[in-house]
Amino acid sequence: MSDLIKIIDQAFEDRANITPATKGEVVEAVEEALSLLDSGKRRVAELGDNGEWVVNQWLKKAVLLSFRLTGNAPMNGGYDKVPLKFTNWSEDQFKQAGFRAVPGAVVRRGAFISKGAVLMPSFVNIGAYVGENTMVDTWATVGSCAQIGANVHISGGAGIGGVLEPLQAGPVIIGDNAFIGARSEVAEGVTVGEGAVLSMGVFIGASTRIIDRATGEIHMGKVPPYAVVVPGSLPGKPLPDGRPGPSLYCAVIVKTADERTRSKTSINQLLREAQN
């Protein structure tokens, strides 16, 4: 593994000279890295023994290098550099994978979908990881290298940002049992803690202030576990002429998820039977 990482790190430093004409060990290393991601054997970010997420930068570099190594080619319904994950899959492969993908769901190769997951017509980008029994609802997007935990619900039209463009240092991470409300957006490497609930239309980036209404504590870049978050606003500074200034968007923690909240956002096991 150390040799693989070394080859990818060195190639990334010389990425300006990497083209579809490149041959040899670089191509083989990137292909092996993408296969590891596609099979779920390795992840762009992994939870360490200390409970902190560790980003495997070499895998993210491999994803970026793959765009330099591959030219566009015709594919069913498109013309792109990245093949689709399910191309030429047999019924047996789908059964073995153990998840459901509704027609219209688009998953790029290099993304991993765990058993029991349900993909409505949605988009899952290269390098992403979708955990067991997670629902990615209609028109939702899971961005490049995003890490989605188990028993998560990504509601309709929600967006989970990627790392490729604009280039981000770390992926978005959604913890187990979290709920992302319809049309919400989580981007720029933000971590959403286990069991957190984002209501409809919450937008959180790295610089978004997440204010705990009960304590006044301000979080940035991380939603605490089991926090229930809604859109809010901060009073603006007065304008030079003394008039009230425009308010600024923020996210507000209104409470900690209780049993009633969890029952409203819980996984419907009737929808998770992939073999039926």
UniProtKB/Swiss-Prot annotation:
Presence of keyword Repeat: yes
GO MF annotations, alphabetized: 2,3,4,5-tetrahydropyridine-2,6-dicarboxylate N-succinyltransferase activity
Residue ranges of the TM segments: none
Any single GO CC term annotated in Swiss-Prot or TrEMBL for this entry: cytoplasm
One Pfam assignment: THDPS_N_2
EC numbers: 2.3.1.117
Signal peptide boundaries: none
Major subcellular location class: cytoplasm
Subcellular location: Cytoplasm
Keyword Magnesium belongs to the record: no
Pathway the protein contributes to: Amino-acid biosynthesis; L-lysine biosynthesis via DAP pathway; LL-2,6-diaminopimelate from (S)-tetrahydrodipicolinate (succinylase route): step 1/3
PANTHER family cross-referenced by the UniProt entry: 2,3,4,5-TETRAHYDROPYRIDINE-2,6-DICARBOXYLATE N-ACETYLTRANSFERASE, ACETYLTRANSFERASE
Assembly description: Homotrimer.
Name this protein carries in UniProt: 2,3,4,5-tetrahydropyridine-2,6-dicarboxylate N-succinyltransferase
Species of provenance: Zymomonas mobilis subsp. mobilis (strain ATCC 31821 / ZM4 / CP4)
